[in-house]
Amino acid sequence: MNTQIIAIANQKGGVGKTTTCANLGIGLAQAGKKVLLIDGDPQGSLTISLGNPQPDKLPFTLSDAMGKILMDQPIRPGEGILHHAEGVDLMPADIQLSGMEVSLVNAMSRETILRQYLDTLKGQYSHILIDCQPSLGMLTVNALAAANRIIIPVQAEYLPAKGLEQLLSTVNKVKRQINPKLQIDGILLTMVDSRTNFAKEISALLRETYGSKIKVFSTEIPHSVRAKEISAEGKSIFAHDPGGKVAEGYRNLTKEVLKLEKQREKNRRCFSH
C-alpha cells in the first residue's frame, strides 16, 4: 500500500487546521480509505475533538512513540492507537509532546524522528494525516520531513501574506535539505463568510498572488457556528450536521484531494514508462 502522508500546516492558530484534519480524514474513510490521524500539537486539540477530553490521562501518546524511536526501543503493532467510531484511527497527543520538542533539539537525526515512527505503520494505512501545531518549531519540521503532501488552511479574514511566505520558505527548506518528496497540495480557504465581499476579495487576491505557483482549492469551507460546537461532541461534521454547508465543503475537499492523487499517480506512470 502506497501510504499518502498529508501534513495540515499553518503556523498561525485558529485557521481550521484541526477541523480540517478530522473532517478530511473521516471524509477519506467514508470514501473507503484506511486512515490514521496524528495529533502533532501538544495542546491535543485533535485528540479532544475526537472524543478524548483528557489527553493527559491517556496511557500512550505521540510523545511516547517518538520517545521509543529516540531510545531505539521497539513499538508494539498498534501501540497507543485509538479507534474512532467514524472509521478513523488516531495517535493522540498530550502536553508531554512539548517536552519531546525540547529533547529533539539535541537528538541525532532530530528532523526525522516522526518519519521513523510512521515508517513502522506505513503498510497499514492508505492515508496518514498530521495535524501540525501552530508554530514552525521542531515538531512541525518533523511533520514536513515525514509528509509527501501538505495542505495549508487559511482563514478568509485577512490576507495572510507574511505568515504564508514564512511557511512556504520553511517548506522549501525542508524539501531542499531533508525531504525532496514534499509537495504542496494547495491552500484551503476556511471560515469563509460568503455574505461579505471581504471574503470574496481575499479569495480572489490569494488566487491572484499564489495561484500561478500553488493550487488554491476550489472548495472553500464556510464559516459555521455549528462546526465550532461539534468539537465538544467528539463527532465529525458529517455525523453532526450531514446536510449542512460545512459537511458539503469537506465532502468536496475530499473529492478534490482524491482527484489530485489520481492525477499525480497518472503523471507518475506516464513518466516511468
Each model region followed by its residue ranges:
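P-loop NTP-binding core
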Residues: 1-273
